[in-house]
């Protein structure tokens, strides 16, 4: 009876959490917290579930120490969460320079925000927003203040990911005033909940690792299973790939023969630096992104990306007639009878009122966001990129380093001495820019355009060489290092995801068919036995090199966007496969195929491969560790998914596949547990709230709890049946899909 109640409550908690994330999307965060996460009945369900779980473990006289420690850690974590809910104080304090403040706005579930008094005062001395050199991308925010506590005074400072503690109050950088003379700090006082919760986290981490090495635990027994030593795994996995549209390079059309720079000259243009995507990078990077975003490929009719970009800059009228804008299938394409690739001039017609889709774009921003208007907005976005390039707005290739402070005006903010700003030829320049520099910035492209139109290519080459020298002299400390520059040029030259997804999928199918042949014919092909593991290693090293390049370029671990995280999952899949394929040969097949499909996803245009500056709050080692470990768990769980599909298809080998799947499942749960709660520690360090019921973390917890069910084979013997196990583990993968994709695309915004 107790077991049934526990099972019902467990399902109820999962359903409530999932429902709350959906309600939050429609009703807002405050509503979801008030009526679900913070509701008395939700807390009661957790409390009863924890109490009955403890009672059931005692009743069954569980003696496995690692199991007892693991479940005890969950009870301690829940106890800490309850203490935080009951006793913690949270709020915001607004500071202005030179004005002592001893009150803050506290969060109150019933009254919303109310004013509370602090047992000390704070007086802001200075607020500073530090930028990445030469860009408008913020590197960090910091506030320096004086703490006045009775007769005692002390100095304090907070910045992103760096907190300040006084008594039981912890202060976090949250926001700031636009004039730079005020700062908003988050306040958190939780002297009881955090120590208890962190104790639970520590015990959880110890017990998760202990679970893998405990001689009396289920995982060590599983590793000794005779099923893993059988050689009768006949793989019958049918994988199919959709048609992938490829664009074949052709020679430039006659219209473009006289509207492009020679390849060598365009390459010199690509070697210049530009302020793009809030960082300084080669113009080549901007050119590649321009082609991919507008045309959907890295080149156009045999022309390099640099030739295409320079063509639009210097021969814009000719290029405006080229079918360069990719039009995706959709309602608007059908209604307006648009081709797959349209020219810029297609969308400008005086007889139809000028900009032919302008009305639809305006309607989109006025709220008509159906499929038709979404496509109009998408096309408009591409057109705006082209127009900004033609006007020169996006060509921020001309740096200037200010030698003295510049007062703020309506055209520019306050500029500190030593700051480097990158200008385009059409920007309004501050009066503090020296005249010779101002003349160069304003006129260099006009002079360059004259030589291009005159066909004086040697002069154009000379212009680009001198412009590069000007950048080196005038850019202060904003240029990337020589190593970063070379790394980016290499990264641009080799589309690692595209090359490796094709290689890995091809080798995966070869390995799959060879495995079937080897198991059915009982014959070995020595060349393949040697070549396939080596090729997996080569692919792994190539991807490692590609990720290392991105790390060097950005200075951040390559996990800052969907594209990079897909590459990282593929990397972990290959690493796991390499480590395990000597013991379990079929893992190599999984390694090729699963990494290939993750690389394929990263290749798809829905994921933007652009490298950018990381938000200050995200620039934390804890976040990097959190994401890395979560990615490893996803890689392991994707292997259990493949085992599940095979187990359903090949029921005669269900037991062997179940054993193999569970080999992946235990470390997957370990890494997921580490990842979720290291993320909680990072959140607490960054903004003072270790668990905020964000949709992403809520679905990660749901996923963890769903997968944890199948390891309870003693209390739920139904999961000892291979078919039941495989069906459950296959369906469980939907929770990962929801966590990774569903939250991003359906539950945000």
Where in this protein do the model-derived segments appear?
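Solvent-exposed, non-transmembrane regions of integral membrane proteins
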Residues: 1-749
């Amino acid at each position: 009876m107790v077991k049934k109640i526990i099972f019902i409550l467990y399902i109820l908690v999962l359903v409530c959490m999932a429902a709350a994330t959906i309600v939050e999307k429609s009703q807002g965060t405050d509503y979801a917290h008030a009526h679900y996460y913070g509701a008395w009945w939700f807390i009661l369900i957790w409390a009863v579930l924890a109490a009955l779980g403890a009672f059931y473990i005692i009743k069954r006289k569980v003696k496995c120490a690692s199991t007892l420690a693991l479940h005890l850690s969950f009870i301690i974590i829940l106890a800490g969460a309850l203490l935080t809910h009951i006793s913690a104080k949270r709020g915001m304090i607004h500071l202005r320079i030179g004005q002592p403040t001893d009150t803050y706005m506290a969060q109150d579930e019933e009254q919303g925000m109310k004013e509370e008094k602090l047992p000390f005062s704070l007086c802001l001395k200075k607020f500073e927003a530090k930028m990445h050199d030469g860009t408008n991308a913020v590197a960090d925010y910091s506030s320096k203040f004086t703490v006045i506590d009775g007769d005692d005074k002390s100095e304090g400072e907070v910045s992103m990911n760096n907190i300040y503690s006084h008594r039981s109050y912890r202060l976090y950088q949250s926001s700031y005033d636009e004039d730079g003379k005020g700062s908003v700090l988050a306040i958190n006082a939780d002297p009881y909940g955090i120590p208890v919760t962190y104790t639970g986290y520590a015990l959880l981490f110890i017990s998760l690792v202990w679970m893998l090495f405990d001689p009396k635990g289920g995982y060590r027994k599983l590793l000794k299973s005779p099923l893993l030593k059988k050689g009768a795994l006949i793989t019958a996995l049918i994988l199919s790939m959709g048609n992938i549209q490829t664009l074949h390079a052709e020679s430039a059309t006659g219209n473009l023969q006289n509207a492009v720079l020679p390849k060598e000259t365009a390459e010199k243009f690509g070697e210049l630096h530009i302020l793009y995507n809030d960082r300084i990078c080669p113009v080549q990077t901007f050119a590649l992104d321009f082609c991919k975003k507008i045309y959907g490929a890295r080149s156009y009719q045999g022309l390099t990306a640099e030739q295409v970009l320079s063509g639009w800059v210097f021969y814009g009228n000719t290029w405006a007639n080229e079918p360069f804008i990719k039009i995706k299938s959709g309602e608007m394409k059908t209604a307006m009878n648009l081709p797959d690739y349209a020219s810029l001039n297609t969308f400008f017609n005086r007889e139809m009122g000028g900009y032919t889709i302008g009305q639809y774009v305006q309607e989109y921003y006025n709220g008509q966001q159906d499929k038709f208007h979404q496509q109009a907005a998408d096309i408009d976005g591409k057109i705006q990129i082209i127009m900004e390039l033609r006007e020169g707005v996006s060509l921020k290739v001309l740096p200037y380093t200010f030698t003295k402070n510049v007062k703020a005006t309506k055209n520019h903010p306050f500029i500190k001495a030593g700051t480097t700003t990158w200008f385009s030829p059409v920007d309004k320049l501050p009066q503090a820019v020296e005249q010779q520099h101002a003349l160069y910035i304003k006129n260099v492209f006009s002079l360059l355009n004259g030589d291009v139109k005159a066909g004086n290519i040697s002069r154009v080459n000379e212009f680009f060489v001198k412009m590069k020298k000007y950048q080196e002299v005038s850019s202060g400390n904003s240029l990337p290092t020589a190593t970063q520059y070379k790394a980016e040029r290499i990264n641009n030259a080799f589309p690692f995801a595209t090359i490796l997804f094709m290689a890995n999928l091809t080798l995966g199918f070869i390995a799959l068919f060879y495995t079937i042949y080897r198991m059915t014919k009982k014959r070995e092909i020595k060349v393949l036995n040697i070549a396939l593991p080596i090729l997996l290693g080569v692919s792994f090293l190539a991807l490692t090199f590609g990720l290392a390049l991105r790390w060097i370029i950005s200075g951040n671990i390559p996990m800052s966007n969907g594209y990079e995280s897909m590459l990282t999952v593929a990397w972990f899949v290959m690493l796991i496969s390499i480590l395990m394929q000597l013991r379990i040969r079929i893992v190599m097949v999984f390694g090729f195929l699963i990494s290939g499909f993750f690389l394929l996803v990263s290749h798809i245009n829905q994921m933007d491969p652009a490298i950018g500056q990381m938000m200050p709050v995200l620039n934390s080692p804890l976040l990097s560790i959190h994401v890395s470990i979560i990615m490893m768990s996803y890689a392991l769980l994707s292997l259990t998914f493949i085992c599940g599909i095979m187990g359903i298809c090949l029921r005669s080998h269900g037991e062997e596949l179940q054993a193999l799947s569970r080999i992946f499942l235990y470390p997957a749960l370990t890494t997921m547990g580490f990842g979720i709660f290291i993320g909680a520690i990072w959140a607490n360090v960054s903004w003072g709230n270790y668990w905020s019921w964000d949709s992403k973390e809520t679905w990660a917890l749901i996923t963890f709890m769903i997968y944890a069910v199948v390891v309870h084979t003693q209390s739920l013997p139904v999961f000892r049946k291979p078919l039941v196990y495989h069906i459950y583990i296959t369906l469980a993968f939907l929770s990962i899909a929801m966590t990774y994709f569903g939250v991003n695309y359906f539950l945000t915004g």
